[in-house]
Swiss-Prot record:
GO terms for molecular function: ATP binding; ATP-dependent protein folding chaperone; isomerase activity; unfolded protein binding. Disulfide bonds: none annotated. InterPro entries: Cpn60/GroEL, Cpn60/GroEL/TCP-1, GroEL-like_apical_dom_sf, GROEL-like_equatorial_sf, TCP-1-like_intermed_sf. Keywords: ATP-binding, Chaperone, Cytoplasm, Isomerase, Nucleotide-binding. ATP binds at residues 29-32, 86-90, 413, 477-479, 493. GO terms for cellular component: cytoplasm. The keyword Signal does not apply. It comes from Clostridium kluyveri (strain ATCC 8527 / DSM 555 / NBRC 12016 / NCIMB 10680 / K1). The gene is groEL. Together with its co-chaperonin GroES, plays an essential role in assisting protein folding. The GroEL-GroES system forms a nano-cage that allows encapsulation of the non-native substrate proteins and provides a physical environment optimized to promote and accelerate protein folding. This is Chaperonin GroEL. Gene3D superfamilies: GroEL (3.50.7.10), GroEL-like equatorial domain (1.10.560.10), TCP-1-like chaperonin intermediate domain (3.30.260.10). Forms a cylinder of 14 subunits composed of two heptameric rings stacked back-to-back. Interacts with the co-chaperonin GroES. Its main location: cytoplasm.
């Protein structure tokens, strides 16, 4: 395929136009008075959102050189979202500012490779300053602040703080769509897995159609149980003890299942059977998790253990187990605290090592089930359009909260960037173009405050000067139109988000400045040839 090539100034100018188109669309959403963007969808209703990365992902420009510029800045938003889960609008805005200032200097004759060095030095210093003013997130109030700022909604802040308080920092919090109009929090304490009873006759509460076993023994095996002879010795022990039994096995079928059901209906003993969760190697790991949580042992083919030889010491114990048609929840397993902690550390190490997003997600779920529990935020709204928008804001707020717990929080509203300017501007270099790179970052650090002010209809330059001349940590509160201590007034941003946005923006922007040629495909005008009814297909002109 033939290519079109543009060089130096022409290439950079065209690509910058693409950068501006994308960034100008995204940056209208920044700050508490930022607006939304409507995205057309091929199916269903349009999507209304203020999430930078969602908007950026939708943008494809017709002009190929402009599109290249837009795609480069899209990467800034995507990478920031992957690392921190929020701050994508800020990252896009910073990238645009660095590219704009950088290109002015490159056009004036500065060397882009040396500018790049200066940008790196300045960004490292700015990140150091951002980390200095960071403080750890302590308790529910701080978490609620971070979430409320991210979602621009105090109710959402409280909801996420409640969820994190209940399941802990390691717990999993998922966001789902609710069938009702209200938004509520549903917490599953203990370990839950998605397998229900094998027979409806096993229920103990016919009204709720669930089985509740108090202080049961738990048999954990990866074998298939087909004949009752396999577990008869164990069942006899259960009858003697007068205890209830939960069987977690690959499957319980045929005669074995029938016998368990008949004895339950006769009232001889209560036993509920469920299939083991997961598949393949993941199933083995999950069974081992359950064993550690309940202080039991996995009766496995691989270890040569026979079900007939199982003693009471091999069985797990728990305060209670609840089983419905689809899920099993083990509450307060009697496992040794140290063993559980060791297992948690092992899973954390695996999360660090794995590169697959899917594996990481599954390991995170296992970690949550062992260490905290699972909370589900059910989002409700009057219309589907509002529901989607609200769900996105909650997901962003959740990511911001986790980032805050990880690396702490600092003053919000772009104040952390402005506070870093004095130290960054002190940096010097004997090489003039390196100093140019430092100056570019010094100027770009003002941009978030400028845009937040602009979106609120206020002159950004005036605000920036006042923030610069105020005490560190004092910034502009858009909602009250006052200059306040940001952290004391609950206007906070996670340090990880602030840092990642700047680092990713600088990385892509500095590379952009070094562009000297751009190559794109020339669309093939003869693409239509060979289609039915197309020119050259003799005798087919009249086809419908």
């Amino acid at each position: 395929m033939a290519k079109s090539i543009l060089f130096s100034e022409d290439a950079r100018k065209k690509m910058q136009e693409g950068v501006d188109k994308l960034a100008n669309t995204v940056k209208v959403t920044l700050g508490p008075k930022g607006r939304n963007v409507v995205l057309d969808k091929k199916f269903g209703s349009p999507l209304i959102t203020n999430d930078g990365v969602t908007i950026a992902k939708e943008i494809e420009l017709e002009e190929p050189y402009e599109n290249m510029g837009a795609q480069l800045v899209k990467e800034v938003a995507t990478k920031t979202n992957d690392v921190a889960g929020d701050g994508t609008t800020t990252a896009t805005l910073l990238a645009q500012a660095i590219i704009r200032e950088g290109l002015k200097n490159v056009t004036a004759g500065a060397n882009p490779m040396l500018i790049r060095q200066g940008i790196k030095i300045a960004v490292d210093k700015a990140v150091e300053e951002i980390k200095k003013v960071s403080r750890t997130v302590n308790g529910k109030e701080d978490i609620a602040r971070i979430a409320a700022i991210s979602a621009s909604d105090e109710e959402i802040g409280k909801l996420i703080a409640d969820a994190m308080e209940k399941v802990g920092n390691e717990g999993v919090i998922t966001v789902e769509e609710s069938k009702t109009m209200g938004t509520e929090l549903d917490v599953v304490e203990g370990m839950e897995f998605d397998r229900g009873y094998l027979s409806a006759y096993m229920v103990t509460d016919t009204e709720k159609m669930e089985a509740v076993l108090d202080d049961p023994y738990i048999l954990i095996t990866d074998k298939k149980i087909s004949t009752i002879q396999d577990i008869l010795p164990l069942l006899e022990k259960m009858v003697q003890q007068g205890k209830k039994l939960l069987i977690i096995a690959e499957d319980v079928e045929g005669e074995a299942l029938t016998t368990l059901v008949v004895n339950k209906l006769r009232g001889t003993f209560t036993c509920v059977a469920v299939k083991a969760p997961g598949f393949g190697d993941r199933r083995k790991e999950m069974l081992q998790d359950i064993a550690i949580l309940t202080d039991g042992k996995v009766i496995s083919e691989e270890l040569g253990r026979d079900l007939k030889e199982v003693s009471l010491e091999d069985l797990g114990r728990a305060e209670s187990v609840k089983i419905d048609k689809e899920n099993t929840t083990i509450v307060n397993g009697r496992g040794d605290k140290k063993s559980i902690q060791d297992r948690v550390s092992q899973i954390k190490a695996q999360i660090e090592e794995t590169t697959s997003e899917f594996d990481k997600e599954k390991l995170q779920e296992r970690l949550a089930k062992l260490s905290g529990g699972v909370a589900v935020i059910k989002v409700g709204a009057a219309t589907e359009t509002e529901l989607k928008e609200k769900k996105m804001r909650i997901e962003d707020a959740l990511a911001a909260t986790k980032a805050g717990v990880e690396e702490g929080m600092g003053p919000g509203g772009g104040t952390a960037y402005v506070n870093a300017i004095p130290e960054v501007s002190k940096l010097t270099s004997d090489v003039a173009d390196v100093k140019v790179g430092i100056d570019i970052i010094t100027k770009a650090l003002e941009e978030p405050v400028r845009q937040i002010a602009a979106n609120a209809g206020v002159e950004g330059s005036v605000i920036i000067e006042k923030v610069k001349n105020s005490e560190p940590g004092v910034g502009y509160d858009v909602l009250t139109d006052k200059y306040v201590n940001m952290i004391d007034n609950g206007i906070v941003d996670p340090t990880k988000v602030t840092r990642s946005a700047l680092q990713n923006a600088a990385s892509v922007a500095a590379t952009f400045l070094t562009t000297e040629a751009a190559v794109v495909d020339i669309p093939d005008k003869n693409n239509a040839a060979g289609l039915p009814g197309a020119p050259g297909m003799g005798g087919m002109d009249g086809m419908y």
